[in-house]
Regions:
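Conserved alpha/beta catalytic core and glycan-binding cleft of carbohydrate-active enzymes
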Residues: 2-177, 185, 202-210
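A short, structured beta-strand-centered segment in the mid-to-C-terminal lobe
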Residues: 182-196
Length: 210
């Protein structure tokens, strides 16, 4: 659709004319080349594009294989498979996993044990393993991001539940239209330390310019 492509390129140019400091990010499922390439080089001129396949692959690996079966070569390929002329933003989890009908990364790793064994005193190998993998997934996704890294709300501390906005199917309920940031406050819950890991991870990469 040439008209649509022209519109997007003009919109990206207009944004920069109005506010040169603005950042434009393209979210595209088609894999169209050039979205985040300079307009002068034949691109559409967005600053970044989402690396949308990464989050889908993390869920695929977790659902279809045990972590002992994960291929390091395959993981490396998917995390670094990007066009050199476009800046990309990587992320380990997005709304596709967190909305009702699916499960968040950490819930797939720990499942029902999250409701009973996330306190610091519990000795549960499923929880310990799930938390360790959750940390490594975020760390390697950030380490290979290159241009930008995104955290979907709640993923930084392992939020246990999905998101569901009020709709006819749930009786217009607001019960799951939330993120429970209060889980990060108590010292006796592991969520606080997952959040601390995320903060330290971001700080390290920023300070060391990685």
């Amino acid at each position: 659709d040439e008209n649509a492509v022209t519109y997007l390129a003009l919109a990206a140019m207009l944004v920069k004319e109005i506010n040169p400091d603005a950042i434009t990010i393209a979210e595209d499922m088609s894999g169209m080349a050039g979205l985040a390439a300079p307009f002068e080089a034949g691109g559409l001129g967005f600053d970044f594009r989402m690396a949308m396949g990464i989050a889908d692959h993390w869920i695929k690996w977790i659902k279809e294989k045990t972590d002992e079966q994960w291929s390091m070569g395959e993981i490396w390929w998917e995390l670094t498979n990007k066009r050199s002329d476009e800046k990309t933003i990587s992320y380990a989890e997005c709304h596709d996993q967190a909305l009702v009908g699916d499960k968040t990364l950490i819930f797939r790793l720990i499942d029902k044990e999250m409701y009973t064994s996330m306190n610091m005193d519990s000795k549960n190998l499923v929880v310990d393993r799930g938390i360790a993998l959750h940390k490594m997934i975020r760390l390697v996704t950030l380490a290979t991001a290159g241009d930008g890294y995104l955290t979907f709300m709640g993923n930084e501390f392992g939020h246990p539940e999905w998101i569901d906005f009020p709709r006819e199917g749930n009786g217009w309920s607001y019960k799951y239209a939330r993120r429970q940031w209060s889980l990060c406050k108590p010292d006796y819950l592991r969520y606080k330390y997952l959040m601390n890991f995320d903060s330290d991870m971001i700080h390290l990469f920023r300070e060391e310019n990685l």
